[in-house]
Amino acid sequence: MAVPARHTSKAKKNKRRTHYKLTAPSVQFDETTGDYSRSHRVSLKGYYKGRKIAKANEAK
């Protein structure tokens, strides 16, 4: 089995891990409903690009 010739220091390990980060989801303001929704997706109220596409799930 392959074994590293030298010990990986904390600094080297942490510098490598700086690239592991989360990206914030892109959200856009929907003027029809007044809510924010993800890009290219139907809003929670059933609107897409200002048009009613689907029925919204009503809370009972």
Curated annotation (Swiss-Prot):
Pfam families in the cross-refs: Ribosomal_L32p
Superkingdom classification of source: Bacteria
Keywords, in A-Z order: Ribonucleoprotein, Ribosomal protein
GO biological process terms, semicolon-separated: translation
Keyword Ribonucleoprotein: yes
InterPro entries: Ribosomal_bL32, Ribosomal_bL32_bact, Ribosomal_zn-bd
Annotated Basic residues bias: 7-20
Disordered as annotated region, ranges: 1-22
One GO MF term: structural constituent of ribosome
Cellular-component GO terms for this entry: large ribosomal subunit
Family that this chain belongs to: Belongs to the bacterial ribosomal protein bL32 family.
Name of the protein described by the UniProt record: Large ribosomal subunit protein bL32
Organism: Streptococcus pyogenes serotype M1
